[in-house]
Amino acid sequence: MKQTTLIAAKDIKKNWYIVDAAGQNVGRLSTEVARILRGKHKVDFTPHMNNGDHVIIINAEKVLFTGKKESDKTYYHHSMHPGGLRRRTVAVQRELDATKILERSIRLMLPKNVQGRNQFRALHVFVGENHPYAAQKPEVLTFVKKGDNK
């Protein structure tokens, strides 16, 4: 009988990837990025270890929503004080801080525990093309858009 081999924490190699969010659908992009942050794309994926990679997302302000979500979708936040419910539409959030749209979408797809918080720290979202991680030599990732595989 074969025994499952587990990778040691010292042997985990973290790769860096860069993704251009321009013209990408929020949900489809978020699921792929969350998969990479968790490490599920690797052969040696282990659920109880953080062996995910770093992901840099550029052009976060150019991400797309389908339908009328730009005006109809509402983000809620409560300050935990009476009358403290705050609402923002996607259009308002995009003007204030476009990176929060993708960060929130991806964070909610990660585990809700210490490991999920550590995996979320490997996400780096930026408005525009510039980012400070050129020294890591990130590998460019492209995802097949729906309808492009014909």
Swiss-Prot record:
> Subunit structure of this entry?
Part of the 50S ribosomal subunit.
Q: Name one Pfam family in it.
A: Ribosomal_L13
Q: Give the keywords, sorted.
A: Ribonucleoprotein, Ribosomal protein
Which domain of life does the protein's organism represent?
A: Bacteria
Q: What does this protein do?
A: This protein is one of the early assembly proteins of the 50S ribosomal subunit, although it is not seen to bind rRNA by itself. It is important during the early stages of 50S assembly.
- Family recorded in the similarity comment: Belongs to the universal ribosomal protein uL13 family.
Q: Which GO terms describe its biological process?
A: negative regulation of translation; translation
What's the protein called, per UniProt?
Large ribosomal subunit protein uL13
Q: Which CDD domains match?
A: Ribosomal_L13 (cd00392)
One cellular component term (GO) for this entry is: cytosolic large ribosomal subunit
